[in-house]
Amino acid sequence: PERDGDYLVDGVINLREGAQVTVVAVMTDADRTRWLVGAPDQDRYLLCEPVRGHGLSGEPPRHILHADQDYALERRGQSSAAGVGMHGRPALPRVATYVYRAGPDQTLWLERWGDQVLMGAATSVSAHDVHFLPGS
């Protein structure tokens, strides 16, 4: 996904898996939507571009072919979910998350809300490259 932009946060989902909290910020810059995924104590974020029309529903497979790349499941988890704002996710209390990799900087982030699957093609960005304005 394109990294540069002045994004406005439309909504936020806090995902809690045990003691680990992951934040998904749904952001827009003009007509571009991106998801910024990460934990406050990590030094890297995933910057995801939503993938439409992927055809997945229910439990995702162990391998996903996307943009001529074979992505293998690296990690999955179950989290409680609490959202605010216009995040575009179903109003469900739990979500399953999946991380797939095809290379060092070729990542897919998936969220499964019941049978609905959301997919983002992601690149890793340094937390030092992400800046939040005061009051955000």
Language model: regions and residue ranges:
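Mixed-charge, low-complexity intrinsically disordered regions
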Residues: 1-136
